[in-house]
Amino acid sequence: MRSIAKLMQNWQFTGPDGSTAAVVLPHTWNAKDGQDGGNDYWRGTCTYSTAFAAPAFDAASQQVWLQFEGVNSSAKVLLNGRTICAHDGGYSTFRVHISELLEKDNRLTVEVDNGINDRIYPQKADFTFYGGIYRDVSLMVVPKDHIALGHFGDTGVKITPALKDGKADIRVETLVEGEGVLSVELLDAAGNIVATADGADAKLHLETPHLWDGVKDPYL
């Protein structure tokens, strides 16, 4: 089973003037100057830092990952003073495997930059490029055999439905890290299993699917 611990409290933020303050996430340093409608809000690099204890896990059968759901716009992540990853793009999730890098007590530092650079587009627009860690940060413990976490921050699962002649075919493609048997179950709104398939490229078929029909029949 997967366990997730949020790292939202007890962060130290070092701003553009070099001063440090305690903050909780989500946080942006443009909360005030980014609201006045002008384009003179501060853009550059600031730093976030927090401490956490290593989670309990079995190194033989489990892995530990850090997950960032949104850091705008570029991020460099350091664990115990060592750079472990960098990410460009403020609107996408990214993760990093840290099992072998953990100590008993750990210091996580994130250098965040919302300045103009040639790696992220658009570089200028009629909206504010808020700088900061504005979505959740999590510590995840997962089995070694798991749905992929390191594939560009996505879920590791692609679902493609096709409807023809009142029947439905659903393709479920899953990226898997490790070994194991992958099973897919499709449930109806009442929790009943209506279709099953096995494998990383599973195909499900429904003879009489109950379709969603807007306000007339909003079935999900």
Spell out what each predicted region is.
Residues 1-220:
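Secreted/periplasmic carbohydrate-active enzymes, especially glycoside hydrolases
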